[in-house]
From Swiss-Prot:
Gene Ontology biological process: translation
HAMAP family, sorted: Ribosomal_uL30_B
One GO cellular component term: cytosolic large ribosomal subunit
Organism: Shewanella pealeana (strain ATCC 700345 / ANG-SQ1)
This protein's name: Large ribosomal subunit protein uL30
This protein's UniProt keywords: Ribonucleoprotein, Ribosomal protein
Pfam families per record: Ribosomal_L30 (PF00327)
Amino acid sequence: MATKTLKVTQTKSSIGRLPKHRATLTGLGLRRINHTVEVEDTPSVRGMINKVYYMVSVEEV
């Protein structure tokens, strides 16, 4: 069975944000505004997305 993936796009800047939130964006593989990555839909990734929900947009692929 194929694993689900999520398309995560950074929509806001990380400048002036908490260091943990910046590190979370890096952990997701995001580098700049409008950068999009595809990640596996796992509980740990969902937790990271929930932590920085105000800076990213998510689509199911």
